[in-house]
Amino acid sequence: MKLGRDRSRREFIQQSAVLGTGVILTGVGAQRLFAQGNQRPDPAKMVASKGCAARDTSGKLSPWSFERRPVGDDDILIEIKFCGICHSDIHQLRGDWGPQKYPQVPGHEIAGVVVATGKNVTRFKVGDHAGVGCMVDSCGTCDSCRHGEEQHCDNDATLFTYGYPDKTSPTGITQGGYANNLVVRERFAIQLPRTIGLQNAAPLLCAGITTYSPLVKASIKKSDKVGVAGIGGLGHLAIKLAVAKGAEVYAFTTSASKVNDIRRFGAKEVVVVDSMEKLKPYNKALDYMISTIPVNYDVAAYASLVKPYGNCTQVGMPAKGEVTINNFAFNRNRVRYSTSLIGGIPQTQEVIDYCAKNKIYPEVQVIKASEVNETWEKVINKEARYRYVIDTATI
C-alpha cells in the first residue's frame, strides 16, 4: 500500500500549493493568512534583496531582484553568507509536492551575519553570526509550539522558509535563502558559535537537525547497532552523529564510489546495495534504522534489518510524499515504522551547539550562484559530496 507522510507534512504540502494565483488555503491556515497581526509593510522601508528564483516547474533558477518586509521590532536582518542546497529545494520548486507560486527563491539552510535588529531584540546584536532553518514563524501558543515543536504547530500556523503564504511578504509568499539577505523574527533565528564556520553551519540547519532529532528520540546509546540508509547530505551527517553517540553504524548506499568516504565518517560496515540480496545478511541485526532515501522505495526491505519491535524512522522526503509499504512484510518483521519532520527551534539550537562542541562538521562543496542549476542536476544524480553550499556573495 502507499503511505503518505505524517499530518504536518501533508498539511505543509497542501498549504504551500497554489490555487489559481496562489495558495490552497484551508482551515486555520487560511484564517492565519488573512488575519496576521502584522500590517502590510511600508514600501518606504522595504529591504531590497536579490536572489536566485525559479519562475515555473522547470525549476530553472535565474537572478531576481525583489523586496523583503521591513525589519520589525522583533526582527533581525541577516546578511546571508552561505546557503545549503537541500534535495527538498528541488522537489518543491519543480512541483513534486504540489503546485507552487512563482517567482520563488528556495533555500532553508541559511547562515550569515546580523546587520540590523529591531528594538525588542535581546538575543542578537549587529555582527553576531545567525542561522535560519526550515521555518520562520508559528502560532507560538499551542502545546506543540510551547514545547519546542513549532514544526508541528497545532494551529497549522507553521510558516516555512520559502513558498508559503505570508501576508507580510511583499511577494505574497516567504522567500528563502538563495539570496543576499533575510528578515526573520528573532525567535526563529539560531545563534551560531564562531567556532564553526558559516559554510559548515548552514547544512546543520536542515540536514543536521533532521537526522539529529530522531536519533535523540530513539535514545541511541553506546554500542547500539544503527543502520543509515541513503548516504547523501542527510545520511553522512546521520553517520557522524550516531558515531559521536557511540553507536556502531551500518551504512547502506547504492553508490560504490562513496565507500571510502563512508568509512572515514566512522561507519563500521558499508553495504553497497546493488541488489536486495545484499540486505539479507543483516536481517534483524540492527537496533535502529534511519532512512534518508528521498525517492519511493521498498521500506519493508530495509526495516527488516531491524530487530523485532525495534524502530525504523523515515526522514527522506520522496516526491509526492509517498513511500511503498508491504503490510505483509511488516507483519512478519514486527518493526515500528515512523517518520520525523526536521526539529523544533530549541532542538535546532541544540544540534548546532552539539556539533560545534564535538567538532562534527558536514562535508561541503562551496559553489557560485551561477553554478546552481548544474549543481541541482548533480544532486539528483547522486554526485554531491556531500552538501553543496552556495557562496551568496556571488549572487
Task: Please state what every model-predicted region is.
Residues 2-7, 11-31, 37-47, 300, ...:
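C-terminal hydrophobic helical "lid"/dimerization subdomain
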Residues 28-70, 79, 330:
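C-terminal segment of N-terminal export signals and the immediately downstream linker at the start
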Residues 43, 69-83, 96-146, 151, ...:
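Glycine-rich beta-strand-centered segment in the early N-terminal region that forms part
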Residues 139-229:
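NAD(P)H dinucleotide-binding glycine-rich loop of Rossmann-like/cofactor-binding domains
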Residues 222, 228-231, 241-299:
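Adenosine-nucleotide cofactor-binding segment
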